[in-house]
């Protein structure tokens, strides 16, 4: 499959740079995978699409203030973006202006450069940094000196709204550098209304890394190697999924990260035994993949040629997806992290589709 097959022209005016102040008022496109029919709604109308006995699964990761600045021993400034918290005092991070930074290099952070970090390892394009602090842990230091990193295409200054609205209302476990954006549309009244309707709600954790914004650099998408991310799917969630399916209910995944977490767990030995699945995953889902768990997916409108739109194509079908995106452009839906949402049901014929135009 060619990377160019997943390209489309997107007017810059449709890229959303600001969040919806009232989360659930964003626009919602509904597409049924088996028919390709499209309906235009508001996100709070999603309650009409979900039935009593269905199970919604959300990603409860929390975005950390992963961007902060420091100084090299030479006095040169660096920008650090945390990729992963490795331990009490260690982080894995990318460093801008990393020239002359090697194992053993010292970097100073915080007020009057009082926090010292040492580069103790280099892994691909990332550096492992050890903080020399006997009081605060790495996450404490990050919380004190860092800022929430908005997606790289948003060039404006961050504001107080971003601090709140670039997190989900059900965030719990710290570790992401980007929000699970499909979940941003849920507010507490909507979650309560779903619960009152008899919809079950549970959570997985997948900490989203910087790789979510990295472009594919291969012409043939099958040659792409996905970045690795930490994932947790509890035994109780696995048991709930099996029980829901057995009773005829549907599994609704909120976000591509949730779907990837569930598929990763499904292919593990822990799934058959209903054990906790705690691991790293680099699962790459693209057309031809046969989905095993999720019946409906809530997701945003994604970048051209991204792994995210490839996942959507695998779930909804290539022709359906491209038709939905063309319809979204014509109807001026907002795209990307702060944009509008889709509710799509699984097209079981998608793996067999000859999608190349």
UniProtKB/Swiss-Prot annotation:
It comes from the Bacteria. One of its GO terms (biological process) is queuosine biosynthetic process. It catalyses: 7-aminomethyl-7-carbaguanosine(34) in tRNA + S-adenosyl-L-methionine = epoxyqueuosine(34) in tRNA + adenine + L-methionine + 2 H(+). Pathway: tRNA modification; tRNA-queuosine biosynthesis. It is an enzyme of class 2 (transferase). One of its GO terms (molecular function) is S-adenosylmethionine:tRNA ribosyltransferase-isomerase activity. The keyword Cytoplasm applies. Its EC number is 2.4.99.17. Keywords: Cytoplasm, Queuosine biosynthesis, S-adenosyl-L-methionine, Transferase. InterPro entries: QueA, QueA_dom1, QueA_dom2, QueA_sf. One of its GO terms (cellular component) is cytoplasm. It is found in: Cytoplasm. NCBIfam families: PRK00147.1, queA. Transfers and isomerizes the ribose moiety from AdoMet to the 7-aminomethyl group of 7-deazaguanine (preQ1-tRNA) to give epoxyqueuosine (oQ-tRNA). Belongs to the QueA family. Monomer. This is S-adenosylmethionine:tRNA ribosyltransferase-isomerase. It comes from Buchnera aphidicola subsp. Acyrthosiphon pisum (strain APS). The gene is queA.
């Amino acid at each position: 499959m060619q990377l160019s097959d997943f390209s489309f022209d997107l007017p810059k005016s449709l890229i959303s740079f600001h969040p919806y102040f009232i989360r659930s008022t964003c626009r919602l496109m509904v597409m049924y995978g088996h028919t390709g029919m499209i309906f235009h709604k508001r996100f709070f109308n999603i309650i009409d699409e979900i039935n009593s006995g269905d199970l919604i699964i959300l990603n409860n990761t929390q975005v950390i203030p992963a961007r902060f600045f420091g100084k090299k021993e030479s006095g040169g400034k660096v920008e650090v973006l945390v990729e992963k918290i490795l331990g009490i005092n260690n982080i894995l991070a990318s460093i801008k202006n990393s020239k002359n930074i090697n194992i053993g290099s010292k970097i100073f952070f915080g007020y009057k450069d009082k926090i010292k970090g040492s580069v103790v390892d280099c892994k691909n394009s990332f550096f492992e940094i050890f903080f020399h602090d006997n009081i605060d842990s790495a996450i404490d230091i990050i919380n004190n000196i860092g800022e929430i990193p908005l997606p790289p295409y948003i060039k404006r200054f961050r504001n107080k709204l971003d601090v709140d609205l670039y997190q989900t209302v059900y965030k719990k476990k710290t570790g992401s550098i980007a929000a699970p954006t499909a979940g941003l549309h849920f507010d507490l009244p909507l979650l309560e209304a779903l619960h009152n309707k008899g919809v079950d709600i549970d959570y997985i954790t997948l900490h989203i890394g910087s790789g979510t914004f990295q472009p594919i650099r291969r012409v043939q998408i099958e040659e792409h190697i996905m970045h690795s991310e930490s994932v947790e799917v509890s035994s109780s969630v696995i048991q709930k999924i099996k029980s829901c399916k057995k009773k005829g209910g549907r599994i609704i995944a909120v976000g591509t990260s949730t779907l990837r977490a569930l598929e990763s767990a499904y292919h593990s030995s822990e799934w058959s035994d209903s054990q906790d699945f705690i691991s790293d995953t680099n699962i790459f889902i693209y057309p031809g993949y046969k989905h095993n768990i999720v019946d409906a997916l809530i997701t945003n409108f994604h970048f051209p040629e991204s792994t995210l739109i490839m996942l959507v194509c695998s779930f909804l079908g290539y022709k359906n997806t491209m038709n939905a995106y063309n319809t979204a452009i014509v109807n001026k839906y907002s795209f990307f992290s702060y944009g509008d949402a889709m509710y799509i049901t699984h097209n079981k014929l998608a793996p067999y589709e000859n999608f190349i135009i």
